Design a protein with these regions (language model features):
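Charged catalytic cores and adjacent phosphate/nucleic-acid-binding surfaces used
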Residues: 1-6, 10-14, 18-20, 25, ...
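Divalent metal-dependent hydrolysis catalytic cores, especially in the metallo-beta-lactamase
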Residues: 23-41, 100-103
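Loop/turn elements at helix/coil->beta-strand transitions in domains of secreted/extracellular proteins
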Residues: 57-58, 99-101
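Aromatic-lined carbohydrate-recognition surfaces of secreted/lumenal glycan-active proteins
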Residues: 103-111
Length: 228
C-alpha cells in the first residue's frame, strides 16, 4: 500500500506559493511515497518535481490541472501540456492520448470550477476516477456528493489536498493498493479502483488566505499584461 498526494500546486500556479522543493520536502516529512504536482494549465514544475523526487526518497508523478471549457480536470501521467479551454470530452481524449489518467477534482463545487455546472452525469462517469475528498472544501457537502456519485456509477475514487502552500501537502491522500513504486503501477491501481481515501479538512482561515492571495496575484498578472 502506497500513500500518494495527487493534487498539489507550486508557485507556477497563479494561486500557489512555494517552489517544488518545498512541496517535496513536506511530502517526505509527511511520510508519503509519491507526489503529483498539478499546477493550473502548466506542467513545467511538475516535470521538475519528477526529476527531483528521488533526492527526497519519493516518486514524482507528472501531471497538471487543466482548465477545460467545463471546469477543472486533473491529468496524471502526462508528459506534455494539455491545452486549456477545450471541451470536456476533448480534454479527456487529449489526456488519454498520452496514456494519462483523468481524475475530476471537486466536481460538485461550482464556485471552484467544478465541472458539474456544465456537463451531464453521464459525461462525469467517463472519468477514470473522481476526487471524492478535497481538503480545501469548506463544507463536506460537495465531497459527499462526489463520493455518492462515484459509488453509484462504479467510478474509482481518489483524494487530494489541493495544497497551495507546502504545509498542506499530505492533508488528504490516496492509499493505493500496490507495492510497486512506479508511475504505471500507481496509475493502473487508480484505474482499477484499488484505492482508499484518507483526509482532513484544510483550516478555513488558510483556505481563505490562499484564495485571497491567488486573486491578488492573478489581478497583478492581468494588469501587467495590459500595460505591456
Amino acid at each position: 500500500m502506497l500513500s500518494v498526494e495527487l493534487h498539489a500546486h507550486s508557485s507556477l500556479s497563479y494561486d500557489g506559493r512555494d517552489a517544488v522543493e518545498k512541496l517535496l520536502a513536506r511530502a517526505a516529512d509527511a511520510g508519503l511515497d509519491a507526489l503529483a504536482v498539478t499546477d493550473h494549465d502548466e506542467i513545467a514544475a511538475s516535470l521538475r518535481a519528477v526529476e527531483l523526487a528521488p533526492e527526497y526518497g519519493l516518486l514524482g508523478i507528472p501531471g497538471m490541472e487543466v482548465t477545460s471549457a467545463a471546469g477543472h480536470v486533473l491529468a496524471l501521467g502526462v508528459d506534455e501540456q494539455i491545452p486549456d479551454g477545450l471541451p470536456f470530452g476533448t480534454t479527456l481524449d487529449r489526456i488519454h492520448e498520452q496514456d494519462g489518467v483523468v481524475v475530476v477534482p471537486h466536481p460538485f463545487q461550482e464556485s471552484r470550477s467544478g465541472v458539474m455546472a456544465n456537463i451531464s452525469r453521464a459525461e462525469l462517469a467517463q472519468a477514470d476516477a473522481i476526487e471524492v475528498y478535497n481538503s480545501r472544501l469548506l463544507t463536506g457537502r460537495a465531497n459527499r456528493q462526489a463520493r455518492t456519485f462515484a459509488r453509484e456509477h462504479g467510478v474509482p475514487q481518489t483524494a487530494g489536498s489541493d495544497a497551495h502552500i507546502s504545509e498542506m501537502v499530505g492533508r488528504a491522500v490516496t492509499l493505493v493498493e500496490t507495492d510497486e513504486r512506479s508511475v504505471p503501477s500507481i496509475l493502473g491501481a487508480i484505474r482499477d479502483g484499488r484505492t482508499h481515501i484518507e483526509g482532513r479538512r484544510t483550516p478555513w482561515h488558510i483556505s481563505f488566505r490562499q484564495a485571497a492571495g491567488g486573486a491578488k496575484r492573478k489581478f497583478r498578472e492581468r494588469l501587467a499584461s495590459l500595460l505591456e
